[in-house]
Amino acid sequence: MSILVNKSSKVVIQGITGSEGQFHGGQMLDYGTNIVSGVTPGKGGIKTLNESVPVFNSVEEAVEKTEANTSIIFVPPPFAAEAVIEASYAGIELVVCITEGVPVQDMVKVKNVLKRNNTRLIGPNCPGIITVDECKLGIMPGFICKRGNLSLIHI
């Protein structure tokens, strides 16, 4: 298995202006993750996370303006599947969906879209993914991971 995220990953946070997006986005930024944009419909044009991250109304717009290639999703369960689909159609290569409680029927639709667009999905209902000292996408504390000869995967 290859490394899925690194310091070159260009990250868009879907749901960046919500409380989870703000808190964990700040943690990821502090870790050194290359967050290039955020998406919250209706809030495009503002900057967040200490005025360092531009917010767009759609993932398509964020990709067009920032060349984002990786997305992390912090949206409520009823909107999570649509957020994954939006990211896939916008050309995002890797989507990490933290949201828990996404309806199974919604994920069936997501699976077909991901396959068609060659998008990888980690989640939903996962803590995220980390490449030590390079990129952290998710809710796990960065200090618990140290560089070494072992990789760990939790299924």
Across the structure, where does each feature detected by a protein language model lie?
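NAD(P)-binding Rossmann-fold cofactor-contacting core
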Residues: D30-L49
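Glycine-rich, highly charged phosphate/nucleotide-binding loops
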Residues: N50-K65, I72-A81
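Rossmann-fold NAD(P) dinucleotide-binding segment
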Residues: K65, P78-T99
